[in-house]
């Protein structure tokens, strides 16, 4: 091992020693041409791995960047540049170095949204490359101004920039669906669900293979898709969408029926603003209750509730007359109550100043009159009240 390393270091010059790192190359002895491929256990430098060792005659897999894979080894070997066949071939460091981007080939960044699209949602730059499948929408409310001016004919004509023509042959291997988007070749996964709402400035067909599920394009497999508009409430239609849009002067009778409507619903009247097939129902009219169904609330009959006087009033007057006392009946029992004074008060019968001799005799009568007067104030006869009428109210 040491002798092999010293011999290889002696063969190298000072100009070739650009990298001092070493890699272990362990080719497995699974073929008969072992001595031609070198010692199975050896340490070789990365700069001299293809010059110091003889070339092996085993099968190699080569790609576009001159990388060859040794099937019987545990490492990747770089093929040496052939000096006789291609004298103008650049060195390996220039081949592997990334090329500076051409400013003409860079995609133009999307223009900032106008004031009309201030409410548009923000989308990352990577997601703005997805192209949704365009479906015509005949709505005249949310159509952008440039398409409305071209379709109506009456407004100012805004010049519409057509996308650049690209010479590329695209195979359409699968019918487009709602989830089929145009993606670069290095994105094999399906686009996210909210990419369907991305507006589209230029309609470009996509191709996909049903076996692998990857998107392919013959001429534009490495070039990114053109920059698209971000999320917006107003859909931006493709350049070929003007023939589906009804003009501003069109009427339901003059404009043709759209092809995506069901056959059974083509005779329904069309809406002027939105393509709704249920315009026969007047959805804008409020459904009010009929007058017959409305039941009138029962009113309170206060005359019926107050048709009887206080109970016990007549009994109080009769008891006062039977006793023969000079005490007048209380003010609330008289038909025409006199003004309140010291001689005519509600509690006159109970608040008179009595002597000590008469206090014991009049004690029982006084308490009875107080209890009776309280009953007349608080108690009423609710027998004739209509309780059902009160509960309904």
Curated annotation (Swiss-Prot):
The modification N-acetylmethionine is found at residue 1. Residues 77-120, 141-167, 204-283, 343-365 are annotated as: Disordered. Keywords: Acetylation, Phosphoprotein. InterPro entries: FAM53. Residues 204-215 have a biased composition (Polar residues). Pfam families: FAM53. Residues 241-256, 343-355 have a biased composition (Low complexity). The modification Phosphoserine is found at residues 122, 162, 232, 234, 255, 273, 299. Transmembrane segments: none annotated. Belongs to the FAM53 family. This is Protein FAM53C. It comes from Mus musculus. The gene is Fam53c.
